[in-house]
Swiss-Prot record:
Family that this chain belongs to: Belongs to the transferase hexapeptide repeat family.
Gene Ontology, cellular component aspect: cytoplasm
Natural source organism: Sinorhizobium fredii (strain NBRC 101917 / NGR234)
A Pfam family of this chain: Hexapep_2
Domain of life: Bacteria
Designated name of the protein: 2,3,4,5-tetrahydropyridine-2,6-dicarboxylate N-succinyltransferase
Lineage: Bacteria, Pseudomonadati, Pseudomonadota, Alphaproteobacteria, Hyphomicrobiales
Pathway where this protein functions: Amino-acid biosynthesis; L-lysine biosynthesis via DAP pathway; LL-2,6-diaminopimelate from (S)-tetrahydrodipicolinate (succinylase route): step 1/3
Entry keyword set: Acyltransferase, Amino-acid biosynthesis, Cytoplasm, Diaminopimelate biosynthesis, Lysine biosynthesis, Repeat, Transferase
Gene Ontology BP terms: diaminopimelate biosynthetic process; lysine biosynthetic process via diaminopimelate
Database matches in SUPFAM superfamilies: Trimeric LpxA-like enzymes
Keyword Cytoplasm: yes
Assembly and binders: Homotrimer.
Enzyme class (EC, first level): transferase
Amino acid sequence: MTNHDLASLSQTIETAFEDREAVSTSTRGAIRDAVEAALNLLDSGKVRVAERGADGTWTVNQWLKKAVLLSFRLNPMELVKGGPGESVWWDKVASKFDGWSVNEFEKAGFRAVPNCVVRRSAYIAPNAILMPSFVNLGAYVGEGTMVDTWATVGSCAQIGKNVHLSGGVGIGGVLEPMQAGPTIIEDNCFIGARSEVVEGCIVREGSVLGMGVFIGKSTKIVDRATGEVTYGEVPPYSVVVAGSMPSGSTMANGQPAPNLYCAVIVKRVDEKTRSKTGINELLRD
């Protein structure tokens, strides 16, 4: 699809979204065709909700988020096959694997272990491995990435190459508010078991999050070496663990208020060290 075609497609979707109250399951023609085309492009990985520039800046293609939102208005509730014992679900979004045969799976080149759930319009790159996990619509999972058991990749989340999302990890989805960016895990990151990264936060390339690290937009990210406090983004090649810091407040009884949770950057490593050092060794203090 040419840039001109994409521009035309995005304009149709932008216009439809402005008058979205008029869009329904009975809508036909250009709007439905445009939304279907956008979902197919997302599903095939030919377009992404967010793209990384050469300078590291992520640009969000808001029109693709709007296409996903419009699809909820266009599609009726229907039976979705694939439940245990031939049971069914009731939803507006089909499985990515609906109608797939051996040929489609071989062409896609990733592993989909029984009981993983991937909704249509999510892209899974070759050599990725999906354990019993959940990947929501509009998400992107990069080449060679492992999505471990009970991990969740939220709507429109962007997961890079050679990432390991450990068991029970939650990567938050962001469809609304419209201006919000998606949650992003860049290439070669390791996210420890039961950790959560949400609300459009970014974990930059090569970073390691220990088990049980929770990062949202309001979470303090403290560099232990410098004392610097930042929000919303983990710098490249950071090793991060869960911690706490003084709240700076005093309770009514005169005692110091409890410490508050934070994420602590315990060290930073270069690319060479990161590639040669085991995860457990990096996390040892």
